[in-house]
Amino acid sequence: MSGRDFGYVIQSSAALWNRLSTFSQRGKALDTRLADIKKALGKPYYETSDVLLYHGDSLELLKSMPQQIFDLTVTSPPYNIGKEYEGVLSIEEYISWCETWMSRVHRATSAGGAFWLNVGYVPVPNQGKAVPIPYLLWDKSPFYMIQEVVWNYGAGVASRKSFSPRNEKFLWYVRDPLNYYFDLDSVRDPNVKYPNQKKNGKLKCNPLGKNPTDVWQFPKVTSGAKRSSVERTAHPAQFPSAVIERVIKACSPSDGVILDPFLGSGTTSLTARKQGRCSVGIEIREDYLDIAVGRLEAEAQSLF
């Protein structure tokens, strides 16, 4: 190990120790935050020491949420394309609806917190067949946008009159562009340490691995008798846990509280638990909440 690499390891270890040493100080604050949420929203549909799930309309529940309570929100709202689990609004109504709930998420986000929004494509009458929803929403919240991340999921629906769609977008926002949590080292790719770059005749690299870039390669959660994903549930638009894991690791502290106001099948809460974070989920459909509860219970049982 070179002197520079050794110094980097020492600095990284010191940073880790500083985070660990503050855990006990923030532990009480964590309990207080969860208690404040229960006081504001009432009895949860499901509750454990690290998960609160609520059944109801996100727009209404977010209105009652305490201010600056969450370190990270990561969610995927309905895309407004008429799937069986969502209604269809006009484009103007959909944008207005998103503006409202995003402003309420902003109010509930901590000073150093982040908001990750996953959205796909929507037809716009007389203008476009598949308009990326980020083009309609990117500046419709009080947050500051850091970056667009492209999720390339590989397999998908084939198309005869256009290129087959193989990606969705994540928009990464923060409350304060000068002070936000970001732990790049926790999500570096350790299998790519030596890219083909040199400086002064020496390889440029980080000993922990490569920055994963803004294009993420993760397979979609698939269905079907021969190709169904292991984590597949009855929800028709399910997040892969690997995507959410990267977001949680990079953009929330180890004792953070995470929100998903459109919880669906519970992937955000399940992944947050596996990463040692607490979470709050809101879902309007009780059958999806029951799926989420079942996944959380199964994961808890697997630990014994």
From Swiss-Prot:
Pfam families: N6_N4_Mtase. It comes from the Bacteria. GO terms for molecular function: DNA binding; N-methyltransferase activity; site-specific DNA-methyltransferase (cytosine-N4-specific) activity. Signal peptide: none annotated. Its EC number is 2.1.1.113. InterPro entries: DNA_methylase_N4/N6, MeTrfase_CN4_CS, RM_Methyltransferase, SAM-dependent_MTases_sf. One of its GO terms (biological process) is methylation. Keywords: DNA-binding, Methyltransferase, Restriction system, S-adenosyl-L-methionine, Transferase. It catalyses: a 2'-deoxycytidine in DNA + S-adenosyl-L-methionine = an N(4)-methyl-2'-deoxycytidine in DNA + S-adenosyl-L-homocysteine + H(+). It is an enzyme of class 2 (transferase). Belongs to the N(4)/N(6)-methyltransferase family. N(4) subfamily. This is Type II methyltransferase M.ScaI. The gene is scaIM.
